[in-house]
């Protein structure tokens, strides 16, 4: 018998196979019949913070929701990779500057820095901030008009001026005031954020003269668009706040251009128009804040004394609500940490043998909000001379209790999955440095 002969083997020839069709041999399953098992969300602890879902992502890094396992406060953490910061011009310097500025600021309308954690092994920094439910730009983009009702815009603008006045009183020029850097809490409190390009004036400076600017082009004043070497820092913030007010009340920008060169050319000339429906009081305030000459431009005191600022505006239109979450479409913006809490506590008894969740080792709490480094410890020799020896310390002044490779006796190691570790011990796990 010929092996190549298909008949004795009960096989079809190529022609017969094509005539019968492949559907006879391959059973097709409709997608509606497939039951998809969602991937289990695995809990992860960074220090004492339980990680939630992604809130947003920018050029510097990701922002995630976290829960403080000690206070149960809802927070947001900005995750920064040192490798990524090196690729951004002035990236590391801007982050360091922002941390140094935020640690000294305490105001209702300025974002608060709660904690800074650093993982030396993974070269990651975690900036833990107070939680804000939404950004102003996100709210503007959620409505077709791209603007707020006058009553709502007035309330936000008053808070912006309060926060800006506080920053200026501390000798800080923000340099990048815009809706994208203004965040909102659940109760409508405005928070000025993103101080990465801000400048702290010298304590004994005679004026507010600045020489550099890295702000968003559409919000820059004529003196920067025209390339002046020096300019008034406070008046730059007044101009940017004026452009912001123009934008949130009209849905437009006072100056536009097809590219940055055209945009700066239009800003440099200083010619703009205000829509008629703004009304005389608001138009007068906008012209004062967008004055071409910095010396004639409104100060914060003049803004506070203006009739539009002091007036109580009636609620003529429906307020713009906080939009649903862009990913989950959750209109209430519920806590994304809840599924991870269930994984953390709900399955501990059933899966005692497993490593139920991840804890990043080597976390260092830097309570003065700078990156950990080395300091020199003076040791006096027999000849009376001092010898400086490098000694690794946490920046809060405490010595590390443990190396990332050395574990104390009797303490469960999270790096070894074979060991049984109860969830309560993992939650209470101390960082590599003593907290003061």
Swiss-Prot record:
Sites bearing Cysteine methyl ester, chain numbering: 433
- Stated consequence of mutating residue 433 to A: Does not affect nuclear localization. Does not prevent phosphorylation at S-431
Region (Sufficient for interaction with SIRT1) residue ranges read: 45-90
Q: Which residues carry this modification: Phosphoserine?
A: 31, 325, 403, 431
Which keywords does the record carry? Acetylation, Apoptosis, ATP-binding, Autophagy, Cell cycle, Cytoplasm, Differentiation, DNA damage, Kinase, Lipoprotein, Magnesium, Manganese, Membrane, Metal-binding, Methylation, Mitochondrion, Nucleotide-binding, Nucleus, Palmitate, Phosphoprotein, Prenylation, Serine/threonine-protein kinase, Spermatogenesis, Transferase, Tumor suppressor
In residue numbers, the region (Disordered) covers: 398-421
Query: Which residue range or ranges hold the Protein kinase domain?
Result: 49-309
UniProt-listed PROSITE patterns: PROTEIN_KINASE_ATP, PROTEIN_KINASE_DOM, PROTEIN_KINASE_ST
* Activity-regulation annotation: Activated by forming a complex with STRAD (STRADA or STRADB) and CAB39/MO25 (CAB39/MO25alpha or CAB39L/MO25beta): STRADA (or STRADB)-binding promotes a conformational change of STK11/LKB1 in an active conformation, which is stabilized by CAB39/MO25alpha (or CAB39L/MO25beta) interacting with the STK11/LKB1 activation loop. Sequestration in the nucleus by NR4A1 prevents it from phosphorylating and activating cytoplasmic AMPK.
Q: What is this protein identified as?
A: Serine/threonine-protein kinase STK11
